Amino acid sequence: MEAAAPEIERCDAGDVESDHDGAAAAAERVPPWREQVTARGMVAALLIGFVYTVIIMKLALTTGIIPTLNVSAALLAFLALRGWTRAPALLLPGGGAASSSSRRRPFTRQENTVVQTCAVACYTMGFGGGFGSSLLALNRKTYELAGVSTPGNSPGSYKEPGVGWMTGFLFAISFVGLLNLLPLRKALIIDYKLTYPSGTATAVLINGFHTPQGENSAKKQVRGFLNCFGISLLWSFFQWFYTGGESCGFLQFPTFGLKAWKQTFYFDFSLTYVGAGMICSHLVNLSALFGAILSWGIMWPLISIQKGKWYPGNVPESSMTSLFGYKSFMCVALIMGDGLYHFIKVTGITAKSLHERSNRRHAKKATDEDTFVIADMQRDEFFNKDYIPNWLAYAGYALLSIVAVIAIPIMFQQVKWYYVVVAFVLAPVLGFSNAYGTGLTDMNMSYNYGKIALFIFAAWGGRDNGVIAGLVGCGIVKQLVQVSADLMHDFKTGHLTLTSPRSMLVGQAIGTAMGCIIAPLTFLLFYKAFDIGNPDGYWKAPYALIFRNMAILGVEGFSALPKHCLELSAGFFAFSVLINLMRDFLPRKYRDYVPLPTAMAVPFLVGANFAIDMCVGSLIVFAWHKINSKESALLVPAVASGFICGDGIWMFPSSLLSLAKVKPPICMKFTPGS
């Protein structure tokens, strides 16, 4: 689940597109597209992409909640390149030749935009590629957790992770998405004037950096980021010394007592999730806490009482025929109810908007009453200037599709070539619907399209091939649809910063190629160093089991559910739809108190501790806003990103130490007093 950053939620796209920063951007000299893609920029994007891939992988393999990191990526891109251009003048006497070279090529907002786009395309592969969900669901451990004897979970329906096939799979499906909607970029960005709120917010941030006032603000943000990065990294290093055994260290600190700790109610001192809580809205964090109380505080203790009646008493709790089955399928029910509701809602909004635009176009053939400010016209002119031929997009799409149709069935024998053909034929239609809906609502529905594809391909594949076919089909559709929407989102940022579509496409392609290599390598490092997918450990990777169970449901239907699980799951599905209806139809002053179903669902499998961490982040933001609202609005994203990056980057040396069999020297553990 990806949560929207509050600073993005507050952005008013209408005001942004006519602001003074935008006018200043339009007035300055815009470099040609080849000068916008620079070697120093690609090096910076590679470093940022690697750092954030490590962070994203940690988040995906622990809880699956991914906050929006685009704003902090833009900040890091600015920091890296501003430092690059100014370092020679500071380090060399008189500035040196390198300094004069830097002056010859100034750091522009266009270069900043391309670097941010490239870095985001790189690290997005960490969760968009399915390493915490559909791809991990293929491994043997998830196959065994789902129940070897479970109907539909056919024997041998697993594939262990490997660098070769994972890299090949990502290359086969990711680049096609870049060409999916390329011929429609003008229609979506200029003709329909879609806002793409997150893309607009990123453009505002980048435009703001490249003004005198914005540079002063950026200095404060950089200082806040570096301070919190250092604190977070040192704290993570300090914590490591106390984790020399099972259930040891500050990660298992029984903050509210041992009884609450057994039900996962404790603060685990994870600055990653404190930072994520600072970025996510208060509603997301409180929804997660509400879900934790409902599940671990009420539901699971009550269902545990039925052990021996509803489910066998002689099987481990991690079995799908035991308590874990109820946890898993009720979580799936909440997510599916939420996803289906929003899928129908966004599809309806998209259809209505397209119909209204069509009617307006017919009614105003001769005259157009819309007025454009000069800055808008200049943006449109720059956006259209560097033309990308449509034939190139069509030919590339056809060629890459043929490669995928040949390669994917070789990787997965259960996936027939015609499954891949169907996915690639549907991709442009689904991609346009998703890109248009994202532009209107800022909700990328690629995961929901992927889940629908999962059920269709799982049912189509039948009992023997259905699980693998469903999971792979889900990954194909999700990635095709997501990449095309992400590209339109980036084109919106480029449109507002006067960045060439060609340089944006090149940056996105380079970032995608980086991600296709970095993400599998990073995942395999984590996979070999830690116990990934253990439902009782830290690295729970809950979405892997959720996706596999959805594939089993697609194959077997409701016969796969434990006793009374169907009734309970149906109740949670209906509850999910109901609270979404309440959010849409209640007066605004009440709807902000209605929880979000998907945020509620994550603690069902993961536990309450991460929800408590995120609520601590919310509490910090709330208190800071009360004390100094202007300072908090400026520094919260930077401080939160520092916490996330410091704790997240420690995972890299930590995993290397684990692979080298270097164990922490101390185990700090808590037991009841005598």
Swiss-Prot record:
It is a multi-pass membrane protein. Induction: In leaves by iron deficiency. GO terms for cellular component: plasma membrane. Expressed in phloem cells of vascular bundles in leaves and leaf sheaths. Expressed at low levels in phloem companion cells in the central cylinder of roots, but not in the epidermal or cortical cells. Keywords: Cell membrane, Ion transport, Iron, Iron transport, Membrane, Transmembrane, Transmembrane helix, Transport. Belongs to the YSL (TC 2.A.67.2) family. Its main location: membrane. Residues 7-22 have a biased composition (Basic and acidic residues). The keyword Phosphoprotein does not apply. This is Metal-nicotianamine transporter YSL2. Involved in the phloem transport of iron and manganese and their translocation into the grain. Transports iron- and manganese-nicotianamine chelates, but not iron-phytosiderophore. The lineage of its organism: Eukaryota, Viridiplantae, Streptophyta, Embryophyta, Tracheophyta. It comes from Oryza sativa subsp. japonica. PANTHER family: METAL-NICOTIANAMINE TRANSPORTER YSL2, OLIGOPEPTIDE TRANSPORTER YGL114W-RELATED. The keyword Transmembrane helix applies. GO terms for biological process: response to iron ion; seed development. It comes from the Eukaryota. Residues 1-29 are annotated as: Disordered.
